[in-house]
Structures are given as C-alpha cells and as structure tokens.
Amino acid sequence: MGTDSRAAGALLARASTLHLQTGNLLNWGRLRKKCPSTHSEELRDCIQKTLNEWSSQISPDLVREFPDVLECTMSHAVEKINPDEREEMKVSAKLFIVGSNSSSSTRNAVDMACSVLGVAQLDSVIMASPPIEDGVNLSLEHLQPYWEELENLVQSKKIVAIGTSDLDKTQLEQLYQWAQVKPNSNQVNLASCCVMPPDLTAFAKQFDIQLLTHNDPKELLSEASFQEALQESIPDIEAQEWVPLWLLRYSVIVKSRGIIKSKGYILQAKRKGS
C-alpha cells in the first residue's frame, strides 16, 4: 500500500467532514473518462480521480495538523468565474440530498458552490426530490423544510430562481400553492414518461412554470456507491464510516452562445458519530 493512501487514510480516520470538489471537468483533459455511459458512472469516476489526485498531494504539514474538515480538490482544474464576465454567464445547479435529513445542507451546498465559483449568487438551483423510504409517496411535508431553506436563499439574494424535479401535477400544485417563492421550473425524466403528462403541461402553462427534461437516475449517488469509490481510491480506510450528505452539480453557460464554459461536482460527506 502506498504512502499516499496511508496518509489519506490517517487523515480520514481523524476528520469529521470531507468536502470534495472536482473543479471544472472541462479542464481535466485526458484524466476525464471520454464516454461515461451514465451520469452515475461519470460521478463515480470523478469522485475516485479527485480522491486519487488529493491523496498524491498531501503535504507533511497537513498530516501533522489533522484538520477536522478535509478539502479534497482537483486543484489544477479549479476555475473561478472572472468578475468582469459574470453578467455574461448563467450559473445553474442541481442539488441532490443524499444522506442528510437537515435542511441546512441546502445552505451549505449553495454557499460552497458560490465560494468554489467565486460568485455571490447562483442564477438557478433545482432541487432533486429528497430521499424517502421505499413504499412511501413523496408529499409536500417531505419537500417543505428544503424548500423553505431555498426560499431563504432567494430572499437573501444567494439564488435568483428555484425549481423542482420529478414532481407530478398534484405535487407541483401543492408546492406552488403553499410556497412563498414559487418554483419557476420542474424537471421531468423522459425515461419514466416519453411524453409530458397533459395535466402537468396545462398546470405549468397556466402558472408560467418551465418544464425541462433530464436523464438523471432516481439515485445519482447512494451511500454504498460513495463508500465503494472511497474504498477503491483509499484502501487504508474504514469507508463504511463515511456517509455522503449532499451532492451539487453545477454548470456555467455563456448566455450569448449557449456553450458550457464550466461544469463540475461538489460533495459533502460526514464521518458517522463525529
């Protein structure tokens, strides 16, 4: 086992929190898998390669410090937005709550995305449906704590517009009627319905909600898949001690040309019992 893995394992054994950021995937060059078959495969590949890169650059000073929060970054790929170009860019994000039942994860994710990209505000954040137990139908009560936090972030000007994902007409209507800050978009997975449901289309049109399509799996990142990626990258670790709390995927698009300038992932994980 390499020294890199031992040092990384020692740090992870003492830390309570892991922040992982891939930087701009467009800057990865040959490191990036050319044709990942799924979003889940791309994500897992990104997690492993970011962990490997971080492990290989651990300094003796860091090992002596044993920080409580580990910043695991693909350092050469980090790219902040030039303030002079900010008005020309649209910064969008999709937030996936994984192993957290705390709505504060929403604020943490948005704050971290703003910091990583060097911006004061995100133009749009779509919230993937929070995890619920098998056999339980998603209800307004499941969405409310996360949506309230998104509303707070809109009111404090950290986000311009907020949207939902995979809500049917009834769920979207309930959220719309209850919410102070209304959803301006709802993503629909075309793998589950080849044609937009007419009742959803009619409701969205009536209330000026944009219907978008996506092809994310129901579970983009599971606790098990994260732990497997962690174990493979850093064998000298008790990977089952670590739980991913949330994952944020962002993209930066040049408005006038519609091209992607930057895209990447940010993730927060916590060690159990810490």
UniProtKB/Swiss-Prot annotation:
The keyword Lyase does not apply. The modification Phosphoserine is found at residue 59. GO terms for biological process: apoptotic mitochondrial changes; blood vessel diameter maintenance; cellular response to fibroblast growth factor stimulus; cellular response to follicle-stimulating hormone stimulus; cellular response to glucose stimulus; cellular response to hepatocyte growth factor stimulus; cellular response to leukemia inhibitory factor; cellular response to thyroxine stimulus. InterPro entries: Gclm, NADP_OxRdtase_dom, NADP_OxRdtase_dom_sf. One of its GO terms (cellular component) is glutamate-cysteine ligase complex. Keywords: Acetylation, Glutathione biosynthesis, Phosphoprotein. Most abundant in kidney. Also found in liver and testis. Signal peptide: none annotated. SUPFAM superfamilies: NAD(P)-linked oxidoreductase. Pathway: Sulfur metabolism; glutathione biosynthesis; glutathione from L-cysteine and L-glutamate: step 1/2. One of its GO terms (molecular function) is protein-containing complex binding. The modification N6-acetyllysine is found at residue 263. Heterodimer of a catalytic heavy chain and a regulatory light chain. Belongs to the aldo/keto reductase family. Glutamate--cysteine ligase light chain subfamily. This is Glutamate--cysteine ligase regulatory subunit. It comes from Rattus norvegicus (Rat). The lineage of its organism: Eukaryota, Metazoa, Chordata, Craniata, Vertebrata.
